[in-house]
Curated annotation (Swiss-Prot):
This is Collagenase. Keywords: Collagen degradation, Disulfide bond, Hydrolase, Protease, Secreted, Serine protease, Signal, Zymogen. InterPro entries: Peptidase_S1, Peptidase_S1_PA, Peptidase_S1_PA_chymotrypsin, Peptidase_S1A, Trypsin_dom, TRYPSIN_HIS, TRYPSIN_SER. Residues 1-16 form the signal peptide. It catalyses: Hydrolysis of proteins including native collagen at Xaa-|-Ala bond leaving an N-terminal (75%) and a C-terminal (25%) fragment. The lineage of its organism: Eukaryota, Metazoa, Ecdysozoa, Arthropoda, Hexapoda. It comes from Hypoderma lineatum (Early cattle grub).
Length: 260
């Protein structure tokens, strides 16, 4: 599946990082070289059909964190007027529950040039939990101080290997330290609130996987939100950037009222 944001046009330097040509281009796309999931494998996975102010529609991923809240990327809902949320199915545009957004909250300090603070919340009507619809756990206690380096985590989204697919895809990326990750980006892009994943094996998120979950599967723990890849391309082997969930727990609690 191709994940997220490829920074398309130019710093007009030798830098691999590029500013996005448009938010639309960053959100449409798929996971690369992933594996096919089945319904119920990732019961927290949300599919987001987003309508923008100019009536264009884009697709992103998200994570169910409560029966009324979805966590996603701010760049996904930039200029959004409404979101249709699909839950409980591995098939794109299908869901055991299909609901309309009630409220969209982007981080007030989101920077569309650097993708700093690239997190957003979507409030939805109450959904009932089932075998195929379950919330993902968020960090708490000592986990809030954990950088999760050198641990494999799972990223999922509706992607493509070599062909278009409507089936949820997933792959694994190794969490790497930010100093190593920062070597591949200009100064100021990789910050404390970024968590990076290695993609040197050719498996990466890309367009359309934006906002999706980055999860420690053995702990059912959400550690990242898909945010960006290098302007060199999704298959370049450059690290992928996620918004670090531990950096935003206070913000999530303040805006949802949920105590995790």
């Amino acid at each position: 599946m191709k994940f997220l944001l490829v920074f398309a046009l130019a710093l007009a330097t030798t830098s691999a990082f590029q500013h996005p040509a448009s938010i639309f281009e960053l959100r449409e796309g798929r996971i690369i070289n992933g594996y096919e999931a089945y319904t119920g494998l990732f019961p927290y996975q949300a599919g987001l059909d987003i309508t923008l102010q100019d009536q264009r529609r884009v697709w992103c991923g998200g994570s169910l964190i409560d029966n009324k809240w979805i966590l996603t990327a701010a760049h996904c809902v930039h200029d959004a007027v409404s979101v249709v949320v699909y839950l409980g199915s591995a098939v794109q545009y299908e869901g055991e529950a299909v609901v309309n957004s009630e409220r969209i909250i982007s981080h007030s300090m989101f920077n569309p040039d650097t993708y700093l603070n690239d997190v957003a919340l979507i409030k939805i009507p109450h959904v009932e939990y089932t075998d195929n619809i379950q919330p993902i756990r968020l960090p708490s206690g000592e986990e809030l101080n954990n950088k999760f380096e050198n641990i494999w985590a799972t990223v999922s989204g509706w992607g493509q290997s070599n062909t278009d697919t409507v089936i949820l895809q997933y792959t694994y990326n190794l969490v790497i330290d930010n100093d190593r990750c920062a070597q591949e980006y200009p100064p100021g892009i990789i910050v404390e609130s970024t968590i990076c994943g290695d993609t040197c094996d050719g498996k990466s998120p890309c367009f359309g996987d934006s906002g999706g979950p980055f999860v420690l599967s053995d702990k059912n723990l959400l550690i990242g939100v898909v945010s960006f890849v290098s302007g060199a391309g999704c298959e370049s082997g450059k690290p992928v950037g996620f918004s670090r969930v531990t950096s935003y727990m206070d913000w999530i609690q303040q805006n949802t009222g949920i105590i995790f």
